[in-house]
Amino acid sequence: MTQNEPTAPEDASLDELRAEIEDIDREIVELIARRTYVADSVAQVKDERDLPTTDEGQEDRVMERAGRNAEHFDVDSNLVKAVFRLLIELN
């Protein structure tokens, strides 16, 4: 089994499943940190170029993309969009 391959419930103990969730949680936090770093870089470029700090068109595109990705992975799009709304508001 590879690191990104989900564990089948019949093949894993509760502890193994919890360890897998812990690994996924760590990856999520790492991705949030990476996204925040890049968003901070975008903000710096906008500041240097005297551009507005918000770009509603770009935010709309991010939200649309989040919805499409949610559908692709069969995840509740409202949940995914809520997470992305928080990420956008934080940066």
Predicted regions and their residues:
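Domain-level signature for soluble enzymes in the chorismate/prephenate branch of the shikimate pathway
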Residues: 1-91
